[in-house]
Regions:
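M16/insulysin-pitrilysin zinc metalloprotease superfamily fold
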Residues: 30-64, 224, 242-301, 337-341
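Histidine-acidic residue clusters that define the catalytic metal-binding segment
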Residues: 28, 88-129, 161-165, 193-203, ...
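C-terminal regions of mature proteins
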Residues: 130-135, 283-376
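Active/ligand-binding-proximal structured segments within catalytic/core domains
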Residues: 1-2, 189, 200-218
């Protein structure tokens, strides 16, 4: 019936109606093509039912087992195998290492409707929920709809949302991922470090410093590859990824040209050592700041044209991560003022902090185990 209701509004699953579950949250998203009160009321009624009165009929549960199992099987490729081989290193000492968000297939095959209902009643409760409405709708009207449909939901006792502290692995590790379907041979250095929780000006600056270091490395690496200075590397990147509510990983990866792992490893270590000794130039930093401020200013000037789904995603992220939500104008003005405190000296200190971090591991992705052993 829910599917029929959504389709009667012109909505399609996957395009307009979506949901996802990660390690830490479940998010339902509905994008309406109109703000007609009748449609809004119907959607709110569905959300109310999902929030308190979801059913777990045996036939539906059994059908969903097959859907989840097929989804799991469809992802058993080289990318998945690589992720599985990396997880013991990347997710060490986190609860995320125990299982993927999709769950364990033994559990999927055997869990009963009663167990699902118990889990749902423990976690999927209104007091664990944030409801976000974005669109061309009067805020008072939207608030009234929320109150009419959700305020009468019973305040059942929900499980406490605990944060399990991540313990550092303070020693260097080595990981070889050998898969015959890997298309490139590459080498990477991963660092694990506490997540910056942005709740004030100082943490705002610190997060920007980490982000700028990643951008500066990427910018320099790409310039040197394109100019032909780095002949043993065909590509590379630096990125920062969240690995737990309180922890992140910052990594540097390069792809070996002609599968020459030894030369690629030497090139990456040389690039890192150059930054160790000389850092980044004032010109490089000014260029990154200027580019970012231009992008932020464009966001201010183009607010009327911004994508509502992106805005919804930003609001959801702010709620899920318990961080302040800033408007484009606030973000631009705050960045313009606070980034003046970011200098090549402060970035050099942040870089040295990273490089002295012992919670790190080298990783090689290869399709030839002999090449990997030679490089190590």
């Amino acid at each position: 019936k829910v599917i029929e209701t959504f389709e009667s509004m012109g909505l399609r699953f996957g395009r307009d109606v979506n949901a996802y579950t990660s390690y830490d949250e479940t998010v339902y998203q509905v994008s309406l093509p109109t703000t007609q009160k009748q449609n809004l009321q119907q959607v709110m009624a569905i959300f109310s039912e999902w929030s308190n009165a979801a059913t777990f009929e045996k036939l539906e549960v059994d059908a969903e087992r097959g859907v989840i199992t097929e989804e799991w099987r469809a992802h058993q490729d080289a990318k998945w195998r690589t992720s599985q081989a990396r997880c013991p290193f990347l997710l060490a000492n986190t609860r995320n290492l125990a299982r993927e968000p999709i769950g364990l297939m033994d559990t999927v095959a055997t869990v009963t409707p009663a167990q699902l209902r118990q889990f749902y009643q423990r976690w999927y409760q209104p007091n664990n929920m944030t409801f976000i409405v974005v669109g061309d709708i009067d805020s008072k009207e939207a608030l009234a709809l929320i109150k009419d449909n959700l305020s009468k939901l019973p305040a059942n006792k929900a499980a406490e949302n605990r944060v399990w502290p991540t313990k550092a692995e303070n020693h260097l590790r080595f990981n070889i991922i050998n898969d015959k379907e890997n298309r490139v041979n590459g080498i990477a250095l991963y660092y694990r470090l506490p997540m910056v929780q942005v709740n004030g000006e100082q943490s705002f600056i610190e997060q920007a410093e980490w982000s700028m270091l990643v951008q500066l490395f990427n910018q320099r690496l790409q310039e040197r590859i394109q100019s032909g200075e780095l002949k043993t590397i065909s590509g590379g990147t630096a990125r920062s990824v969240k690995i737990a509510p309180d922890y992140q990983s910052l990594f540097f990866r390069v792809n070996a040209r002609d599968d020459n792992m030894q030369d690629a490893a030497n090139a990456l270590m040389a690039e890192l050592a150059t930054i160790d000794q000389h850092g980044f130039s004032a010109e490089e930093l000014d260029d990154v700041k200027s580019t970012r401020l231009t992008w932020l200013k464009n966001a201010v000037d183009q607010q009327a044209e911004r994508d509502l789904r992106m805005l919804t995603s930003r609001l959801a992220s702010s709620s899920l991560n318990n961080t302040p939500f800033l408007s484009p104008e606030e973000t631009y003005q705050l960045s313009k003022r606070l980034w003046q405190q970011i200098t090549v000296q402060s970035l050099a200190e942040k870089w040295q902090q990273l490089r002295k971090n012992q919670d790190a591991f080298w990783e090689q992705m290869v399709n030839n185990e002999v090449a990997a052993k030679k490089a190590l």
